[in-house]
């Protein structure tokens, strides 16, 4: 049994308070407040996800993060603190791969959101460019989110947390999860000995490798950060043509197959 990493029945104003801990994201540290200017917080009354600002009007996240009455916050670090340059938007339009909400747990878990109006760059808000190349196996990558810092029991922090993990060959994830198809549009990333991982509530957030936005968190084992059970991330590089075409106004584009 595995789970999609989105939190259900989450109330953003009722986050469980987490004592200061060395286990952040799971196994990381509090993020530097200046390292996540592109990070979006998506929420409604029932769900929480992350997202990535790729220009002043567009956010990229996971398709399973689609929710009614969604609000999108930029410039957030501690959810209990309102920052001077914090900005809130809502979706003007949502785009799914192959027009589809028919993504499955293995494939096409990507959603592009056009905001109702452009954001203003500020000290804590700025977009992150799409990748120029795919990541290499062995790359050290950064994950971040407001998801649970404990698993399987959940504890939701006020402050954003980050951790470093590694890109593995896709076959490492196929060995861990035999039901995975042979697709290569998914990145396999984690720590083989366990201890660091994205988890419930981190869905849709970025995987950043060598400063480039390479993946979107979407799937993992029921209990996070277990040995030899890496997480799965939508491979952003494989969807660049689709993303750029949508932004340019070609909403009928379908790529890759």
Swiss-Prot record:
Statement: the UniProt record of this protein carries the keyword Protein biosynthesis: no
Residues of the signal peptide: 1-18
Family: Belongs to the peptidase S1 family. Snake venom subfamily.
Top-rank lineage group of the source organism: Eukaryota
Disulfide bridge positions per record: 31-162, 49-65, 141-209, 173-188, 199-224
Subunit structure: Monomer.
EC number: 3.4.21.-
GO molecular function, one term: serine-type endopeptidase activity
Source organism per UniProt: Gloydius brevicauda
Family matches, as SMART domains: Tryp_SPc
Domain (Peptidase S1) ranges: 25-248
GO biological process terms held by the UniProt record: proteolysis
The protein, known as: Snake venom serine protease salmonase
Tissue-specificity statement: Expressed by the venom gland.
Keywords (A to Z) from UniProt: Disulfide bond, Glycoprotein, Hemostasis impairing toxin, Hydrolase, Protease, Secreted, Serine protease, Signal, Toxin, Zymogen
Propeptide: 19-24
Known function: Snake venom serine protease that may act in the hemostasis system of the prey.
Active site: 64, 109, 203
Location relative to the cell: Secreted
Main localization (coarse): secreted
Glycosylation sites: 78
Single GO cellular component term: extracellular region
């Amino acid at each position: 049994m595995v789970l999609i990493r989105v939190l259900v029945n989450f109330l953003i104003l009722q986050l469980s308070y987490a004592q200061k801990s060395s286990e952040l994201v799971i196994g990381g540290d509090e993020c530097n407040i200046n390292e996540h200017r592109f990070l979006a917080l998506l929420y409604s009354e029932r769900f929480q996800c992350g997202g990535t600002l790729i220009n002043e009007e567009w956010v990229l996240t996971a398709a399973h993060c689609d929710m009614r009455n969604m609000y999108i916050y930029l410039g957030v670090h501690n959810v209990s603190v309102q920052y001077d340059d914090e900005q809130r938007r809502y979706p003007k339009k949502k785009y799914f791969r192959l027009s589809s909400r028919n993504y499955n747990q293995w494939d096409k878990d990507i959603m592009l959101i056009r905001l109702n109006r452009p954001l203003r760059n500020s000290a804590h808000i700025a977009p992150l460019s799409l990748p120029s190349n795919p990541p290499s196996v062995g790359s050290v990558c950064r994950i971040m989110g407001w998801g649970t810092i404990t698993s399987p029991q959940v504890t939701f922090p006020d402050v954003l947390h980050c951790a470093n993990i590694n890109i593995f060959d896709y076959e490492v994830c196929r060995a861990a999860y035999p039901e995975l198809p042979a697709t290569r549009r998914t990145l396999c990333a984690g720590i083989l000995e366990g201890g660091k991982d994205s988890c419930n509530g981190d869905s849709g957030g970025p995987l950043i490798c060598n400063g480039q936005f390479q993946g979107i968190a979407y799937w993992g084992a029921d209990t996070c950060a277990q040995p030899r059970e890496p997480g799965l991330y939508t491979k952003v590089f494989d969807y660049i043509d689709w993303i750029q075409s949508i932004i340019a106004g070609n909403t009928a584009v379908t790529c890759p197959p």
